[in-house]
Amino acid sequence: MQKHLPLAVMVLCCSTTMFAQNTTSQQPNKPTDENVFTFTEAQLGEDDNMTQNVTILNSATNAYASEVGYLFSPMRFRYRAFNQKYNEIYINGAPVNDVERGQFSFSSVGGLNQVTRNVDFSLPFESNNYGMTGMAGSNNYNFRSGSMAVGHRFSLAAANRNYTLRGMYTYNSGFNAKGWAFSGNLTYRWANRGYVEGTFYNALSYFVGVQKLLGNHSLSFATWGNPTERGTQGAATQESFWLANNYLYNPYWGYQNGKRRNSRVVTDFAPSALLTWDWAINNKSKLTTTLLGKYSIYKSTKLNYNNADNPQPDYYKVLPSNFYDVWGNILRFQTPQALADWKTAYEWLSSSKAHRQIDWDRLYEANRGASAQGADAMYYVQARHNNNLYLTLASTLTKNLTEKSTWNLGFNVAGNKGFHYQTMDDMLGATSFHNVNNYAIGTFAKNSDAVQYDLNHPNALVGKGDKFGYDYNINVLRTNLWTNYAETFGILHYSLAAKVGYDGMNRDGKMRNGLFANNSFGKSKTANFLSGGFKFAGSVDMSNGSVLSLGVGYEAKTPNAYVAFQAPEMNNDFVKDLKNELIFSSELSYQFSTSWLHANLSGYYSRVNNATEWTCFYFDDINSFSYNSLTKLNKVYYGVELGMKFKLTSFLDLKALGTISEAKNISNAHVRYLNSTQGTYNDDEAIVKGIRENGTPLTAANLGLSFHQAGWFIDVNGNYYDRIYLGYSPYYRYASALKAIGATDAKGNYIVSPQDKGKGGFMLDASIGKSIRLKKGTLSFNLMVTNLLNNQKIITGGYEQSRSDYSIKTDGTTSDRTYRFSKNPKLYHVYGTNGMLQVAYRF
């Protein structure tokens, strides 16, 4: 076993040195424990409280960045609270971030731990040989067969997390005498019931690769995928957690014929393949070209209803606080009858688990009754599909100009076609359903064209597997040209990077929506954007182990197609005033290294102007979906990071890490929204200044001990988290809505509810392992336990409900509700004590 603790190695291996050029090696890596490269569920983006993926980042020389990605992953930690779209991911030099949403789906490589171990990381101001580094850093995964650790490896693991069993086999041949290298990986992960009741997990991961050396050329081919089906977890209010006496109450499942059934099932598969040509032109120049393609298939089901009561078991109208004012300031909701109704609701929901879950049998019975009367399904399971066909070509020329200077020049071009549609997954015993906008009936006559989802096929009958509601494609073309230069002379090192790019995008509607008959079917106009930016980084070696570094950058970044369309499910319109984001980033760092201490202290400041955000939510007041775009939004990110690692003895290390950061809006925004029942646009101001980034702790700290000797390792980490904000509702903060309820002071300033914040706290994690050298191979045992103290009060994320505390009367006046949405955000609590036991044999 290696001398250093595997958990410390987990985020250190295969990293770049500070400001150093990364080069792709075709020599097999030294064997390292597989645990080191296991992505957590949060890192894979398979936790259901995540609107954004966590950032998987690393550095060989930064004591803070080398640890936090894994250590803080139970809290869905994002580096500097940046959106993961600013963390740019490559495979063999080809960009693989989702072109529409901007984020990379790590679930597409889930289970391929022995493949993803071969990776180069670049912090925001480190140079690399695959592109200008993103604001949140960049990763380049090396999928060449000849670069993988030679040998066989088999492992079995048992866990009580998203999956309960995992088996993995890996084989890498290394190069034979004829210059061939072969590799393969097969992993199966399974859970009949995951950590959260009602969830399940079923995934089979595969990787096949081959590489051939041809003189000073090399050709590499690889194909991989991770077909996954999993039942998901829903957020809930504190009232629901209290009723269930369970911080992990999951409203997404219920009993059908006595068996558990989940209403929100995700099916995810992104088969991918690449071909890489490496050409060592001479001993100073190298050309790398990669052609990569993938077809992503993503399907997510949801229980819905039609002219019926909401079937969700945690719907606010069935909760006790909907009958009695528990907040204590509206007397007409505190009558004896209201209290009796509260008790009735409480006794019903607390008396049986089945009463707190979906009653599937009742839904089937209701549909059979509707069918007998010739009516459409009252309840059904719909499936939202978001598929993408992606093809990219990337090429990089690397030239070592001198022993101390390197120049890179590269380009990439990518095309993406996104297929977005909705299908009928299960009619729950009903016999008919029509492709009609029932939300619009009432605003428009039942026989009006306006209520048709597709005027090309009016009143179409919908059966299992048929499309309904919406069907459209998003087409994106992206090109990028970049270069960087790095040089060292004496005690100074500096690097320069620049890029310029083009993005074009349009929508191609496949249904003629009745509310937008002339602006929904066929292709929209194409929006064109020019982008570009530059970065400078410099460092000074001040001797005695001290290095001072400075980095600055500026970029004009194209908005993602995901936020570019106002109501893509309804029409071809782009968001009004859609512009490039303007990004300024800077960092000042100090590093100190001796034989007994490695320390980093960094301060950073980044600003994003012209940000665009897009949301869609159900607007209960008018029984409508609301499509919201926020533009002209400015954001700021700044903070301090500290990482220290002390070598107490040859076998014992002490580490201390921490960050105090800020990530918030520094302006209000223009909001435009469209309600699905009306088909008209509304413009307003969103009072969102001061709103913070959500779903990640803005304050986090760690103190850990690492023991490693004679094949044993023991690691104990105490982590503290605070300032975990929830996703905010723009609707709460519309200027018009605030005026309607008189939320202004004497000077006319708006009185805005503070953003909801989750409870932080302390978590204790530990791991122990042993590596045994055999006559043939190595046998290792690892036990990792998270949240040893079972502190489930910590909130990992959640969101405000986009509904008001008042209803709107027909005369336009408002009336208070008993239930307070502003007091009841939907939350996710951290998992309690959970762990994994693994046995691995390498030979």
Give residue ranges: language-model regions.
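Gram-negative outer-membrane beta-barrel transporters
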Residues: Y605-R607, N628-Y732, Q838-R842
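Signature of Gram-negative outer-membrane beta-barrel scaffolds
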Residues: Y380, T406-S543, V563, P568, ...
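Acidic/polar loop-and-plug regions of large Gram-negative outer-membrane beta-barrel proteins
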Residues: Q211-L213, S218-T276, K299-Q382, K446-V462, ...
